[in-house]
Amino acid sequence: MISVTVEVDVDRPPPEVFNYLEDAENNPKWIPNMRSCRWTTPAPVTVGSRYEQTSEFFGRQIHTSFEVTEHHPGRLVTIESREGSSFPLKVTRIVDARADGGSHVTEEVEGDPSGFYAIATPLLRAMVVRNIRRDYKNLKRVLESAPQ
């Protein structure tokens, strides 16, 4: 089992940050190894909404189906991979307001790798931490450089 938590401060208002994060189709814009991401259910995002994504990790294409399993608009969204995905994964993204009007973002990732990935669990955890930190630096850069 892999469990990782990453936090970042973003100098943008929480509603803007949350709206960007909850729309999975934005993922390829700030996650470099994300190749594609599309909703398979209609808007708005709510518990039960689903999307498909393709990413690359360890040089392998990873196809994952996700479902929103918890949703508190403006603050928290949890997604979980569904059957047929490369490996079980649960991701929770939380956006909290800072006193200065900016946002504090927390991402909690839990995964249970199997097959090829299970063999490499210690290396996999280190790479996941590194990649998520890089991703959230990108998120900060993308959102803070966007016109207000």
Could you tell me what each predicted segment is?
Residues V128, I132-P147:
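Short amphipathic alpha-helical signal-transduction/dimerization elements
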